[in-house]
Amino acid sequence: MRFDAVTLFAEMFDAVLDYGITRRALDRGLYRFKSWNPRAFTDDPHRTVDDRPYGGGPGMLMLAEPLDRALNAVQQELASENLAPWVVHFSPRGRPLTQQRVMELKDMPALVLLCGRYEGIDERLLQRRVDEEVSLGDFVLSGGELPALALMDAIVRQLPGALNDAESAAQDSFSAGLLDCPHYTRPEVWQGMAVPQVLKSGNHAAIAKWRHEQSLRLTGALRPDLLERAQHDERN
């Protein structure tokens, strides 16, 4: 799999590329990454990538032309590898990112992560070049880099070979439409709180049953919307 990020702040992606599971997966060749700075696709001496919005208002907007040129360069390089790009833009107006969508996107051969800044991007560029808009939630961030990092991390951990224990991804929250169950490690008693006895029983069927019940309990208490959705999907 290949990720290409169109971003003014490529160094932010070091958080994924240099640490943990995503670093090991990169070292194992499970995915590739390349960043593209829109400033490299400008003509003026100041490498301008933003301007004032028509109609007035606060802040600046990213210009369409440098982003369009950057995306053309990405597309050309991907075409040389017979890869078709899927361009994702991160925006509060996008559809909320879910584990189901992560699982679908991980099968894409090439994702282009378009990271906006300032007050956003000229709408004409979005209409012409973007395949999908994604949101992490109903809040505003300073740019698209953090959502892009979150998406990369979520996808990479699902790639075969990324996790040392293949069952870890299958047990993640949302993988079965529910929150994950509670987990415990040593010592058996910590500050007067003991590990549930069933987890020490060695009875795998009982442990699996307990974990499923706990997932249902937590989901019902903390995210009843997920439980309703899972029940609806099961009926259909």
Curated annotation (Swiss-Prot):
UniProt cross-references to InterPro entries, sorted A to Z: Alpha/beta_knot_MTases (IPR029028), tRNA_m1G_MeTrfase_C_sf (IPR023148), tRNA_m1G_MeTrfase_TrmD (IPR002649), tRNA_m1G_MTases_N (IPR029026), tRNA_MeTrfase_TRMD/TRM10 (IPR016009)
Localisation per UniProt entry? Cytoplasm
BP terms from Gene Ontology: tRNA N1-guanine methylation
Q: Which CDD domains match?
A: TrmD-like (cd18080)
Q: Which gene encodes it?
A: trmD
* NCBIfam families xrefs: PRK00026.1, trmD
One term of GO molecular function = tRNA (guanine(37)-N1)-methyltransferase activity
Name recorded for this polypeptide: tRNA (guanine-N(1)-)-methyltransferase
Q: Which UniProt keywords apply?
A: Cytoplasm, Methyltransferase, S-adenosyl-L-methionine, Transferase, tRNA processing
Q: How does it assemble?
A: Homodimer.
* Functional summary from the UniProt entry: Specifically methylates guanosine-37 in various tRNAs.
